[in-house]
Amino acid sequence: MIKKASLLTACSVTAFSAWAQDTSPDTLVVTANRFEQPRSTVLAPTTVVTRQDIDRWQSTSVNDVLRRLPGVDITQNGGSGQLSSIFIRGTNASHVLVLIDGVRLNLAGGSGSADLSQFPIALVQRVEYIRGPRSAVYGSDAIGGVVNIITTRDEPGTEISAGWGSNSYQNYDVSTQQQLGDKTRVTLLGDYAHTHGYDVVAYGNTGTQAQPDNDGFLSKTLYGALEHNFTDAWSGFVRGYGYDNRTNYDAYYSPGSPLVDTRKLYSQSWDAGLRYNGELIKSQLITSYSHSKDYNYDPHYGRYDSSATLDEMKQYTVQWANNIIIGHGNVGAGVDWQKQSTAPGTAYVKDGYDQRNTGIYLTGLQQVGDFTFEGAARSDDNSQFGRHGTWQTSAGWEFIEGYRFIASYGTSYKAPNLGQLYGFYGNPNLDPEKSKQWEGAFEGLTAGVNWRISGYRNDVSDLIDYDDHTLKYYNEGKARIKGVEATANFDTGPLTHTVSYDYVDARNAITDTPLLRRAKQQVKYQLDWQLYDFDWGITYQYLGTRYDKDYSSYPYQTVKMGGVSLWDLAVAYPVTSHLTVRGKIANLFDKDYETVYGYQTAGREYTLSGSYTF
C-alpha cells in the first residue's frame, strides 16, 4: 500500500505512473494542479521532458520534442518555421492548451491554436505534458491536454554552443546563470538560428504559378530572469523574453498581384511573481504581459504595403493560486484574470476588440487507504459568452501493491476565437465548444517494466463549423473520439527502452467520416545506451494512415495518406568534462512523406554541434 504520508511532502514507493523521459516517480510536476507534487500522485497520464532529454535527442525545434510523446500528432506545412499544428488524442489543434511557465501562450492573431514552430527551442528547459481534460483547472482550450513549457533553468554555470547542418542550418547559443550573493540568481540567454530551408512546393495551394524557391527560417532570441529569496518562505522573480522570427513560405499567387509569402513575427513576454512556500500553505501571485505582432507581406513591397496584413495582440494576465495540505492530500483554490486586446485588422477583423475572462477554481487531492481521489471545479465569466462551468474527478485504487486501476471523468470547453466571432464571416452569438471525456487505466511495475494501458472516449459537441450556404460560423459540429494508449519504459542491461502505442478513432459524429490529419495508429520507441563513453540514441516512429484534403481543384477531394516508418540516429561524445560534441541523422532512410497534403518534408538531414560548459 502507498505510505500514508502527505502527497506533497512524500513520494510513493511504487513506480506509478505516466510514461516519461524522467522515469523516477519522485519527479515533481507543477502542471497538474498548479503546485509541486510527486508525479506518482497525479492520476492523469503525465510526461516530463528535461533539458537533458532535449540535448540527447539533439532536437532543433519544439515540434521535434513533442512528436516523440504519447498521443501527439504534429502536422507542418514543410520544414523549420512553417505553420504547424498539435493534435492530442485526436482532438482539434485548438483543443490543446499551451502554457509558458504556467501562463497561457499569447496566440498571435487570435487564431485559437498554438503554432509552436515559432517558439525557440533555446528557451525550453523542461516540458510537462498532461493528457485529458484540464479545463476545470485552467479554463478554455484544455480539451485534449495541456503542454507546459518551462523556461526556468535549474543549474548554475555558463554554456556556449554552436551547430551546423543540412539546408545551411546554423545555430549559436550563449546562456549563463550566476548567483549574486546567497539569495539572488540571474539568468541570461541569447540565441541565433537560421536555415535556408528547401522548397516546400505546396502543390495545389499556390494557384497556377510554381514557386521554386527555398523556404527558409530565421530566429533571434533574448531571455533574462532575476530571482530573489527574501526569506526561507518568501521569494519573488522578474522574467522577460522576446524573439524575432522571419519565415519564407509558399503562398497562393495570382499573376499581376503581390506575392505575400513572408512572415515576420515579433513576440515579447514579461512576468513577475511573488511566492510563499510554507510547510502547510503555499501561495503565489503572478502577473504577465505579452505582445505579439505578426506580419505577412510581399518582401518586394514591404510590411507596410496595402497588400500586407498585421495581426497584433496584447495579453494581460493575473493569477493568484493557493494550496493547503490537509490530511493525506491537499486543497487548492485560485483566481485567474485575463484580458486580450487586438489591433484593427487582426484576423481580418476591421475593428480592434477586447475580451476579458475571470475564472475561479477549486482543486482537491486526498488519499484514503488504498484509494486516491482527485477532483476540480471551475467557473469562468467571459465578456463574450457569459459564464461557463467545468468539472472533473478521478479515483485510483491500488488493488495490489504496485498495481493501480484509475477511472476518470471530466468536462472541458473551447471558447470561440476572434475571427469566428467578429470576422467577415463571424457570428458574435457563438457558444463555446464542449467536451465530455471518460477514461479507464491500469498501471504498474512488472519485472522492471513500468507500464500503463488506458482506454478513453471523448464526445465533443457544439463544434464551430463554417456553413457554405449562410456564409457564417455556427455551433453545429460533433466529434466522437475513442482511443487506446499503452506506454512502457524499462532497462535491459546497458539499454534503456521507452515505447508507446496509440490507437485513435477520431470521427465526425454526424457523418461518421475520419477527422483529418490524425493518424489512426502510432508507435514510438526510444533506445538509449552508452558504449566507450559514446552516448547513442535511436528514435523510431510509425505514423499510421491519415486523411487530408486536396485543394488543387474544386470541389475539394479527401485523400488518403499512407503510413510511414521514420528512424533517427544520434550520438554524443564528451571530449572533456567541459566540451561535448554531438551528431545526428534525422529520417535516416530518407523517407518521402507528408503530414499536410501537398507540403513536402525535409528528407534526410544531418546536424553536427558542440557545447562548452564552465
From Swiss-Prot:
Residue interval(s) of motif TonB box: 26-33
Record flagged with keyword Metal-binding: yes
TM stretches of this protein: 158-165, 169-178, 184-195, 217-227, 232-248, 263-277, 279-296, 309-325, 328-337, 353-369, 371-381, 385-400, 403-417, 434-443, 449-458, 473-490, 494-509, 517-529, 535-550, 558-572, 585-596, 602-614
Gene Ontology terms for molecular function: ABC-type vitamin B12 transporter activity; metal ion binding; porin activity
Domain TBDR beta-barrel: residue ranges: 155-614
SUPFAM superfamilies: Porins
Ligand binding (Ca(2+) 2): 213, 215, 249-250, 261
Keyword set includes Chloroplast: no
InterPro entries attached to this UniProt entry: B12_transptr_BtuB, Plug_dom, Plug_dom_sf, TonB-dep_rcpt-like, TonB-dep_rcpt_b-brl, TonB_box_CS, TonB_rcpt_b-brl_sf, TonB_rcpt_CS
Position of sequence motif TonB C-terminal box: 597-614
PROSITE patterns referenced in this protein's UniProt entry, alphabetically: TONB_DEPENDENT_REC_1, TONB_DEPENDENT_REC_2, TONB_DEPENDENT_REC_3
GO cellular component: cell outer membrane; pore complex
Residues binding Ca(2+) 1: 199, 211, 213, 215, 250
Binding residues for cyanocob(III)alamin: 83, 85, 92, 110-111, 251, 309, 517, 551
Keywords, sorted A to Z: Calcium, Cell outer membrane, Ion transport, Membrane, Metal-binding, Porin, Signal, TonB box, Transmembrane, Transmembrane beta strand, Transport
Signal peptide: 1-20
Stated role: Involved in the active translocation of vitamin B12 (cyanocobalamin) across the outer membrane to the periplasmic space. It derives its energy for transport by interacting with the trans-periplasmic membrane protein TonB.
PANTHER family, per database record: COLICIN I RECEPTOR-RELATED (PTHR30069:SF53), TONB-DEPENDENT OUTER MEMBRANE RECEPTOR (PTHR30069)
Annotated protein name in UniProt: Vitamin B12 transporter BtuB
Source species: Escherichia coli O157:H7
Gene: btuB
